[in-house]
Amino acid sequence: MKQSLFLKKCSKFCYVLFAVCGCLACTQNHKIEWPQVTNETKPWTRWWWEGNAVRTTDLDTVMRKYQEANLGGLEITPIYGIHGYEDRFKDFLSPEWVDLFLYTLQEAKQLGLGIDLANASGWPFGGPWVTPEDACKTVAYKTYQLKEGEQLGEPVRYKEEGFVRLAGHTPVKLADLKEPVSANADLQTLALDQVRYKKELPLIIVTANSDKGECLDLTSKIKPDGTLDWTAPQGDWTICALFQGHHGKMVERAGPGGEGDVIDHFSASAIDHYLSKFDEAFKGKDISYLRYYFNDSYEVDDARGESNWTPAFFEEFQKYRGYDLRQHLPALLGIDTPDKNARVLYDYRQTINDLLINHYSIRWQHWAAKQGKGIRNQAHGSPANILDLYAVSDVPEIEGRDLVSIKAAPSVAHTEGKKLSSSESATWLNEHFQSNLGDVKKALDLFFLGGVNPVSYTHLTLPTIR
């Protein structure tokens, strides 16, 4: 019995020993290979072209240094210029600028550096070619109460008092600015952040809703002087008037030739007109080496008030939600029952979400795809489901220092089968000149923990060599 037990133990020992030796032999025969290093596996960097004060001699020098430092690629973002170098400024997308961009693509290809390009000089999308019709909008409103037999005793008008917000230190008075904003000289020095002109806003619609559930469209009863030619019939009536306003957000940090109004992100024609400027600038040019176009987040509402309207909103709302919002303006403005207010507001926000996805993100991605390129998009901050917006992007990109927020872009990349999810890296550290490489490593570690694979440092400037 004891001998049998001993033999069984020996047999088990020999079996385990044989298995271990076999595994060791397999391990010794298997050579572990490090994955191939490409420019996508290396860190990239945002590359400010300050004032587009770029020369080919500068490009030759610094791009070689970037390659020697093992950077994988450069994301070109033209921004505002440096005082004292105005004589070297070049307008974004001008023929001279395009020639320098083509030279950069050629040099990058020779050095094995990738190149991405921001689809704006600064952010968000916008510029001097954006007309007032294509610029971001806001909606203003007035409400009135009437009883049976009463008439409105004041004109239905809304006057925008106007204001100007500045990103720089040059004093600017609203009265000194021409309209549209693109008509003003030296926008680079003015550094405007938001401009709303003092003016009367155009009327969109006037409706009357009764306590019995009736709804009347009174827009045709408004006289040229704003008088409402209507007497309230039986019941208590709520009069709602909507007016279309100019939101006034300007492109942030814009470089020469990029200053101007931000686009209406909810309008398909606005993004089409905007991107046609790039088509025109690059027509007949070889930009095949360009990898992705880039957008540095939504940030339209980084301003006073929100961009919350587009001229075709009523029609789009009915298409997406299946009913006429014009009949429910009291609920939209939050003065109906709490339940109805909440339901209509939800539908309004969902429609904004749909327009931002379908009229902006998807159209932008399709435009890039027709060129054989993709888009990198920072969707955070958008008035929409950012996960859906990230899903449209070829490379979802995130920023920040909160791990849960960081995971948003990589999570979508994972579920949608996208191989890359990038980050705007090391932007938010300590105060200026108080950060060190240890702080940078800590920031990058957090991105890697959150699922980001390629990182894009923010940022490098282009040294202007005298």
Where are the regions a protein language model picked out?
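Aromatic-lined carbohydrate-recognition surfaces of secreted/lumenal glycan-active proteins
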Residues: D116-G122, F294, I357, S361-A384
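Conserved, mostly hydrophobic/aromatic
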Residues: W47, A108, Y293, A368, ...
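C-terminal motif of bacterial Sec signal peptides marking the signal peptidase cleavage site
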Residues: L24-A25
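Mature extracytoplasmic enzyme cores
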Residues: H30-P35, K42, V54, D58-D60, ...
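The substrate-binding groove and active-site-proximal loops of carbohydrate-active enzymes
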Residues: P43-V54, H83-V98, A254-H273, N341-N358, ...
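Conserved small/polar residues in nucleotide/adenosyl-binding loops
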Residues: T458-T464
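Substrate-binding cleft/loops of secretory-pathway carbohydrate-active enzymes
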Residues: P124-A135, Y298, D302-G305, R376-D402, ...
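Catalytic-core region of carbohydrate-active enzymes that cleave or remodel glycosidic bonds
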Residues: A369, L387-Y457
